[in-house]
Amino acid sequence: MSNVKRGGKFRRARKKVCIFCVDKAESIDYKDVAKLKKYITERGKILPRRISGTCAKHQRQLTDAIKRSRNIALLPFTTE
């Protein structure tokens, strides 16, 4: 974790908690486009773990779901 200097004092940044672990999600559905769009940048790239806050297991499932939904044209590969 990175230390953040704020007002002359160093404060430790809070660790992000995986949203899918909190919800006890078994798997991530590739057809749930609204949820998948939260983990894609405006350029169409998949957000990394350190930004999205997901755990390694759910990041892999998220990546597979995004790639699968791109292949069946539910999500765009890139944006203009």
UniProtKB/Swiss-Prot annotation:
PROSITE patterns: RIBOSOMAL_S18. One of its GO terms (biological process) is translation. Keywords: Ribonucleoprotein, Ribosomal protein, RNA-binding, rRNA-binding. The keyword Lipid biosynthesis does not apply. Disulfide bonds: none annotated. InterPro entries: Ribosomal_bS18 (IPR001648), Ribosomal_bS18_CS (IPR018275), Ribosomal_bS18_sf (IPR036870). GO terms for molecular function: small ribosomal subunit rRNA binding; structural constituent of ribosome. One of its GO terms (cellular component) is cytosolic small ribosomal subunit. The keyword Coiled coil does not apply. Pfam families: Ribosomal_S18. Binds as a heterodimer with protein bS6 to the central domain of the 16S rRNA, where it helps stabilize the platform of the 30S subunit. Part of the 30S ribosomal subunit. Forms a tight heterodimer with protein bS6. Belongs to the bacterial ribosomal protein bS18 family. This is Small ribosomal subunit protein bS18. It comes from Clostridium perfringens (strain 13 / Type A). The lineage of its organism: Bacteria, Bacillati, Bacillota, Clostridia, Eubacteriales.
